[in-house]
UniProtKB/Swiss-Prot annotation:
Pfam families: RNA_pol_Rpb6. Belongs to the archaeal Rpo6/eukaryotic RPB6 RNA polymerase subunit family. It is found in: Cytoplasm. One of its GO terms (biological process) is tRNA transcription by RNA polymerase III. The keyword Transcription applies. It is an enzyme of class 2 (transferase). Its main location: cytoplasm. The lineage of its organism: Archaea, Methanobacteriati, Methanobacteriota, Methanomada group, Methanobacteria. InterPro entries: DNA-dir_RNA_polK_14-18kDa_CS (IPR020708), Pol_omega/Rpo6/RPB6 (IPR006110), RPB6/omega-like_sf (IPR036161), Rpo6/Rpb6 (IPR006111). PROSITE patterns: RNA_POL_K_14KD (PS01111). One of its GO terms (cellular component) is cytoplasm. This is DNA-directed RNA polymerase subunit Rpo6.
Length: 61
């Protein structure tokens, strides 16, 4: 994840988690270790917390 400001707004956070959860539900491999069966949204949250989510946030100036 690459950003100019390291703090995400709640809207950016929701968008990232939703987009990544959709990818995971469509068959994308999770980038964090999963010990139990988790919901795609929970997996996406875990990826965001560990900062391994493969998505970028671009903000217009």
């Amino acid at each position: 994840m690459h950003m100019a400001s390291k703090k995400l707004t709640r809207f950016e956070r929701a968008r990232l988690i939703g987009a990544r959860a959709l990818q995971i539900s469509m068959g994308a491999r999770p980038l964090v270790e999963i010990k139990e069966s988790l919901d795609p949204v929970d997996i996406a949250r875990k990826e965001l917390e560990k900062k391994v989510m493969p998505l970028d946030v671009r903000r217009d100036k």
